[in-house]
């Protein structure tokens, strides 16, 4: 009886660890998606003004980044 209980506890621990890792990966992905919210945005037109100058800078050359441009 004790062997079965020990085996059950071991299996439950392994399943719990797998579940916790899965949840942690989902939260990490959600966190990185939220942090990625500041990623450069496409300009309306290359070499034109950014759609949101306060957030992305005054001038675009491919992709808008805060106060600088990057060709993309």
From Swiss-Prot:
UniProt key word Transcription: no
Pro-piece positions: 25-41
Subcellular location: Secreted
Keywords of the record: Disulfide bond, Knottin, Secreted, Signal
Keyword Ribosomal protein: no
Main location: secreted
GO CC entries: extracellular region
Signal peptide coordinates: 1-24
Tissue specificity remark: Expressed by the venom gland.
Disulphide bridges: 43-61, 50-64, 60-69
Domain comment, as recorded: The presence of a 'disulfide through disulfide knot' structurally defines this protein as a knottin.
Protein name: U1-sicaritoxin-Sdo1a
């Amino acid at each position: 009886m004790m062997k079965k209980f020990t085996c059950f506890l071991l299996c439950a621990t392994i399943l719990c660890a797998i579940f916790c890792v899965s949840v942690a990966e989902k939260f990490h992905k959600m966190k990185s998606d939220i942090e990625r919210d500041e990623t450069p945005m496409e300009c309306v037109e290359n070499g034109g003004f950014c759609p949101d100058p306060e957030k992305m800078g005054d001038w675009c050359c491919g992709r808008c980044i805060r106060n600088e441009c990057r060709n993309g």
